[in-house]
């Protein structure tokens, strides 16, 4: 077979005519310094603040500090494979996380990658982790209650959908338990819950996940975890990833609860990053924008107006105190951002008052707007009565010669403390809460010995399930108290069957 030169030249000419050159321009820089999870790169002149960049070994980073001659990049993954002189390129994208229904029931890291061993998350939708909070005209005032199932909270410091309520206290005072009970109580409430674990032990997160699974709460919960062994950038990003996942549902008109456990560790991680990129330290060595770190996160919690779909995002941030000092820097910052705080006190916790809520220092700035009518009626004076009891209790230790009125207040206060105690992971429906608090505030428990009050409560609930369904149904449907005569008769009828212990 002979090769014909004309055919070959015709083929070559055709290929030359069809050739199209595509020029790919990518903004590339060079790593000039690496260490402690931070890289400095030269040559990325047009990079945006917060933009994702990619290193030669496919590890991603985020531009944090834009300086005159170099860029400070936090590395979102293992940084041991990156070395000086390596190439780093812009992606043109800011940090995003996957969002959607597919995340429900999963445990993911702050980048949205699953860590529960159940395979990939099947979703194509993403949201940027930093997005503007809803504007003034896009919001409406908080008016729907978020029932926690915890009597002391629903009666004294009620939380509404769209509210930011800080849970503050020393370590080991039951902060996480309050959040878990609240999540468990959202079953059948049309609520998506997101639990963000920041700097927690892996074993603690595992326990939380198993508790949620045992109570069937993982069916409507997303767990975002950046454990203590993760690099500081992931601890810093975790709350923003959680709120971005929640916003997806909020803007679709659904109701979301996000728990940040806890923001003290996020602040410490951000302080670490800021010091590594040489930002000047301020009070307690935190950078100057530490307030903005938390305010821009918590302002994204809102109750949207009907025009925007009427969805809501409720935030329960945690802050850990040292020896009950709520006047430290991070606690005072977050107290000033949120719509109230629930203060858990270690003294109460160790004296077996659990949940260990200090009624005097806890407050909800939404208040009665986040309570049903029935609860407002029965719990109106409860806070003041409890505060007065704590004051009298201190004085009563010094003298036994007390007048009748003071003795009555002390007796009522002791019973109030007993009624507000609650077992772990046993949230109580609001209609039952209303009836036991009604019995307390109307004096029906005054002749019940203090040691029998909790047994009285348990047996009263069982009696209501059998004989008082019409009362419970009335509160459930109308949100108001039933006829007081019917209530009084029902409580008296139960008291006749209750046997006081000897």
From Swiss-Prot:
EC number: 7.1.2.2
UniProt keywords, alphabetically: ATP synthesis, ATP-binding, Cell membrane, CF(1), Hydrogen ion transport, Ion transport, Membrane, Nucleotide-binding, Translocase, Transport
GO cellular component: plasma membrane; proton-transporting ATP synthase complex
Membrane topology, as annotated: Peripheral membrane protein
Catalytic activity: ATP + H2O + 4 H(+)(in) = ADP + phosphate + 5 H(+)(out)
Marked site: Required for activity: 362
An MF annotation (GO) of this entry: ATP binding
Localization per Swiss-Prot or TrEMBL: Cell membrane
Enzymatic class: translocase
Protein name stated in the entry: ATP synthase subunit alpha
Organism of provenance: Geobacillus stearothermophilus (Bacillus stearothermophilus)
